[in-house]
UniProtKB/Swiss-Prot annotation:
Oligomeric form and interacting partners: Homodimer.
Stated name of the protein: Dihydroxy-acid dehydratase 3
Taxonomic placement: Bacteria, Bacillati, Actinomycetota, Actinomycetes, Mycobacteriales
Membership in a protein family: Belongs to the IlvD/Edd family.
Molecular function (Gene Ontology), one example: magnesium ion binding
Source organism of the structure: Nocardia farcinica (strain IFM 10152)
GO CC, alphabetical: cytosol
Reactions performed catalytically: (2R)-2,3-dihydroxy-3-methylbutanoate = 3-methyl-2-oxobutanoate + H2O; (2R,3R)-2,3-dihydroxy-3-methylpentanoate = (S)-3-methyl-2-oxopentanoate + H2O
Amino acid sequence: MPPLRSRTTTAGRNAAGARALWRATGLTDSDFGKPIVAIANSYTQFVPGHVHLKDVGEIVAEAVRAAGGVPREFHTIAVDDGIAMGHGGMLYSLPSREIIADSVEYMVNAHTADALVCISNCDKITPGMLNAAMRLNIPTVFVSGGPMEAGKAVVVGGVAQAPTDLITAISASANSSVTDEGLSEVERSACPTCGSCSGMFTANSMNCLTEALGLALPGNGSTLATHAARRALFEKAGRVVVDIANRWYREDDASVLPRNVANAKAFRNAMALDVAMGGSTNTVLHTLAAAQEGEIDFDLETIDEISRKVPCLSKVSPNSDYHMEDVHRAGGIPAILGELRRAGLLHTDVTTVHTPTLEEWLDTWDIRSGKASAEAIELFHAAPGGVRTTEPFSTDNRWSSLDTDAAGGCIRDKEHAYTVEGGLVVLRGNIAPDGAILKTAGIDEDLFSFQGPAVVVESQEEAVSVILGKKIKPGDVLVVRYEGPAGGPGMQEMLHPTAFLKGAGLGKQCALITDGRFSGGTSGLSIGHISPEAASGGVIGLVENGDQIRIDVATRTLEVLVDDAVLAERRAKMEASERPWQPVDRDRTVTTALRAYAALATSADKGAVRRVP
């Protein structure tokens, strides 16, 4: 049996100094020899998805103590992508993923913790902690803060708006027909409670994926932050982590370790879920990164393969008026996985931290299986409270009925899928030989084939300027380059450009392609993650204004219609220039911290992880 890692600092004469310090934190003789459980919290007053997490660490800690473990809590940073959006703050978002992963690794290894509970929620925090868990490979349970309630419907300028969210507010700000009073009405309704933004954006997508990976408990991705039912998830996480720690250290059961739970089959399941639910394109970036951290065989080719055979079964905001509370009412992640299981598109022989196999989990938690437990039925009745609040567990409202409509409800079956192929696709071509990502769940099928002239800009700020300056016309392809992991640096999200296109009435008439990335709130013909990026010598850096760009989803291609000989001439000219593969006229402050990230960052097809010599 493997010894407790913490014995290094709790057992033997040589550990006297460390034990003295442990005692100063409150430990006693009876604690030495028990598994020390690190609780990685991410509470901050900057982020609505984390503002309510201040006390939940103690809920987990109490459960750990009761189960026979020794809890020790610490905190990571957390960047709010929405607040950082549209200015220099967004340069720090993706690099913060690496800082979070490093900080968790540092704390856990420096203090020889035996197990880990990750209390995450928003965009880069769950991926950062996931990367750390895959690196550390010690017993780990994820429990997130939960989704925000959707904003309530409002009337703006005589037009009824569907339940609102962050994207509604951003799009309205670019719509000149919306008055200041109307915009204020939308803004005040859009984000009514604590929790991760209410649509199938990056945060909620990743929290759903941790369920599919087997590292989080049932309901983790969809139970609202405000609902009393979520408290039980934190309590159970504390019990489960001690159980799996004991199975590893006392029974030599390696099946509970993250790399054996979230193995190659589990990553395939997670991506099948992502494709089926039309998740954020950022999930591609983050799953690729996590797989690399865990040395799991999972790459962009695997994602492409999955996207070709898994149908799109659910469309949630920003792609419909459904929000996470509606996904929950329809049975949450187990219901989507259940439909994939019935379609033969799931590996059910993988394990989870809470149930021996995925097969057994879905038998008792899929509300459409006919065998769902009373616990599952009870959980998925949890409904929004409809009250503005930053308090977790503050409502106990219940839906009067569940949404089990597989033909036209929030979650459909394969026979009634939105599209035969999934909501995310990998495109390739001369402009993206190493791949690019498109969220097809966010566009109409009549846009699956598109061609138009390039309008080239070399920063997100310039993109916003040309859109708001009415320089983009129907049929144009806006090319935003030098916004990749190294070129940005930091691979900014292009939420403002896409939201402003939508607000200007161009969301279905133009395309936007970039070596940057998109918010989970992005919709429209928005292609990101173009690899190689411009700063790494990618062809996107050679595109000129007026070049014809062709997009064809059916053939999975993205091309600039310029002869190879012409591209070769442009490349030679670029290489001979004074500042090759750099933006010509961009005013941007790049700090030492960002330059350090840029020096090591890989392109998006590698997950934008750091390449360390």
